């Protein structure tokens, strides 16, 4: 598995990133508060992670999906050693090009207020399949 440890997770020459964090990479990248340069989705498959998103503290646990919007400040305080996160991130320029925020304007305040949503295990499996598809596409 690729070891991601780059502060600039969203490079301008890539439309999206897709990885599995099995080594605590997210915590190393965001070990102090930083602005999210793209839109990041996290899917927690096991373990837990203490994180501050947009000045609010949260705990990510198994079967949680997390949405971190661009320009949001993020700080990972702790990742348990067994934490497994799927990460899918989209470059800000890509999102601007497809007018994502215009079509989701009604939901933005809800995503800011509630960035973490617990899922039923069967729904987590569906998201896991989708994340794996994007991970495989990225490697092509």
What are these regions (language model features)?
Residues 109-140:
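Amphipathic alpha-helical segments enriched in hydrophobic/aromatic residues interleaved with Lys/Arg
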